[in-house]
C-alpha cells in the first residue's frame, strides 16, 4: 500500500512537471521563409530568381534558403549584403560564386555599388529578400533592402520580402529622427528614429508607401509573432545576424550604445562580449562604471572591466572601461541609457581632439544638436520635447503598417 502511494506521488509529480514545462514553453514563430516553403510553387515555379540573402536566411530547422530552393527552383543570381552570403566576411565583400552551389554572387557592399543594376537583373524575374534585421536605423541591411526595392521598381521586377522578427522590438520606438543632411547615407537612409520597432516586412511596406518608392513588393508574413517579443522568445534558431552580434545581450548593447562606435573607443569587437564591453586604454574603468551605476539606469548595471580585443579598435591592447550587464530587459529605458552612457564617455575622453572625435557620432545618432547637447552636459527640455514629438509622429504613421499585434 505504501509502495502504491509512493508511485502515485511520483507520477503526480511527473505530470505536474510536464504540464509546467508545456506552459513555460517558448512560443513558436514561423518566419516568412517557413511560410513560403509551404506554398513555394505559387510564387516561384517557372521564374528566374534573384536572392538577396545572407547566412541568417534559414528555416526553423536551420536550413539555408539557397539549399532549400536550389536546384528545384531556378536561382540565377545571389546578391550579397554586408558580411557576405554565408556571413563570414567582416569587411570587404567581393563578387564570386557560392561555395556550396557555385551560383554567381554579386556584392552589394562595394564602394561604388550598393544595389543591383539593370544588367544584374536581366535574367531575374523576381527578387527575394530574406535577411535577419535587429531593428536599429544604422544597421545596413535595411538600406540594402531599400536600394533593392528602388532597383526592382526601375527595372519592373517584383520583390518578395520574407519577414523575420525584429530581434528587440520590445525596446520600443526611440531616438532622434535622422536629420536631413544625413539622408541617403548607407548606414542611415531615411528619416526615422534610432529604433523603429518594426519587422523588416513592416519596414519595407512603410518605406515603399511613405517614401513613395512604389515597388511591386509582397511581404510573406510571420505567424505567431508579437511586437513585445525578444528574438529568444520566438523559438527560432539563432544565427548571428552579423559577426559581432553574438547573443541577445549584444543585440541590446548595440541598440543602447552602438551609435557611439565611431568614437575613439573599443565597443568589444574582437572579444567574447561585443557591445557589452566598452573601453579604451586611457579610461579609468572603476570611475566610469561607478558614474554609470550612480545614474540608476533601470534594468542595467555596470561593472569595471579590463579587456584586450584581438581585432578592431585597440587590437591587442589592454582597454579599461565597463561591462554592460542586463538585469531586467523589460525595465530598460533606451533613450535615457544612451544619453547617460554617451555623456559619461564624453567626460572621460582625452581633451586633445575630443570635440572632433565626438562629432563623429552625429550621423549614427542622427541629430547634431542632440549630440552637442550631450557634450555640453545640457538637459535641454526643448530638444527632448522635440525628439519626443518626432517619435510620436513617426509612431502614429508607423501604426498603419504594422502586421502584428
Go through each PLM region and give its residues.
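Bacterial N-terminal signal peptides
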Residues: 8-17
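Short internal beta-strands
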Residues: 76-83, 162
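Glycine-rich, charge-decorated loop segments at or immediately adjacent to ligand/cofactor-binding or catalytic sites
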Residues: 87-92, 160-183
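Glycine-rich oxoanion-binding loops at beta->alpha junctions
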Residues: 94-124, 136
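Glycine/threonine-rich flexible loop motifs
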Residues: 133-145
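Conserved anion/nucleotide-ligand pocket segment
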Residues: 183-254
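Glycine-rich, aromatic-lined ligand/substrate-binding cores of catalytic
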Residues: 225-305
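Conserved functional hotspot residues or short segments at active or partner-binding sites
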Residues: 279-386
Amino acid at each position: 500500500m505504501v509502495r502504491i502511494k509512493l508511485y502515485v506521488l511520483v507520477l503526480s509529480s511527473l505530470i505536474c512537471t510536464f504540464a509546467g514545462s508545456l506552459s513555460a514553453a517558448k512560443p513558436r514563430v514561423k518566419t516568412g521563409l517557413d511560410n513560403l516553403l509551404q506554398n513555394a510553387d505559387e510564387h516561384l515555379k517557372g521564374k528566374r530568381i534573384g536572392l538577396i540573402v545572407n547566412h541568417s536566411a534559414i528555416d526553423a530547422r536551420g536550413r539555408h534558403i539557397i539549399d532549400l530552393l536550389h536546384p528545384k527552383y531556378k536561382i540565377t543570381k545571389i546578391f550579397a549584403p554586408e558580411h557576405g552570403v554565408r556571413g563570414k566576411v567582416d569587411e570587404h565583400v567581393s563578387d564570386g560564386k557560392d561555395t556550396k552551389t557555385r551560383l554567381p554572387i554579386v556584392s552589394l557592399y562595394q564602394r561604388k555599388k550598393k544595389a543591383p543594376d539593370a544588367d544584374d537583373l536581366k535574367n531575374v524575374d523576381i527578387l527575394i529578400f530574406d535577411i535577419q534585421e535587429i531593428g536599429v536605423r544604422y544597421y545596413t541591411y535595411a538600406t540594402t533592402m531599400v536600394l533593392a526595392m528602388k532597383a526592382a521598381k526601375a527595372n519592373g521586377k517584383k520583390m518578395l520580402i520574407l519577414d523575420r522578427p525584429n530581434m528587440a522590438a520590445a525596446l520600443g520606438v526611440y531616438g532622434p529622427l535622422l536629420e536631413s543632411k544625413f539622408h541617403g547615407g548607407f548606414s542611415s537612409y531615411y528619416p526615422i528614429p534610432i529604433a523603429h520597432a518594426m519587422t523588416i516586412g513592416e519596414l519595407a511596406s512603410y518605406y515603399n508607401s511613405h517614401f513613395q518608392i512604389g515597388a511591386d513588393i509582397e511581404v510573406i508574413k510571420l505567424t505567431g509573432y508579437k511586437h513585445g517579443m525578444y528574438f529568444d522568445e520566438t523559438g527560432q534558431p539563432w544565427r548571428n545576424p552579423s559577426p559581432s552580434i553574438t547573443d541577445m545581450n549584444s543585440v541590446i548593447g548595440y541598440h543602447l550604445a552602438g551609435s557611439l562606435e565611431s568614437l575613439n573607443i573599443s565597443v568589444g569587437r574582437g572579444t567574447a562580449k561585443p557591445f557589452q564591453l566598452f573601453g579604451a586604454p586611457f579610461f579609468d574603468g572603476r570611475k566610469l562604471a561607478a558614474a554609470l551605476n550612480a545614474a540608476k539606469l533601470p534594468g542595467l548595471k555596470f561593472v569595471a572591466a579590463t579587456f584586450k580585443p584581438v581585432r578592431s579598435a585597440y587590437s591587442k591592447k589592454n582597454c579599461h572601461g565597463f561591462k554592460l550587464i542586463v538585469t531586467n530587459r523589460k525595465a530598460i529605458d533606451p533613450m535615457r541609457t544612451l544619453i547617460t552612457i554617451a555623456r559619461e564617455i564624453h567626460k572621460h575622453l582625452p581633451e586633445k581632439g575630443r570635440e572632433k572625435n565626438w562629432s563623429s557620432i552625429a550621423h549614427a545618432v542622427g541629430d547634431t544638436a542632440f549630440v552637442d547637447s550631450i557634450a555640453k552636459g545640457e538637459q535641454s527640455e526643448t530638444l527632448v520635447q522635440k525628439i519626443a514629438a518626432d517619435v510620436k509622429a513617426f509612431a502614429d504613421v508607423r501604426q498603419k503598417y504594422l502586421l502584428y499585434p
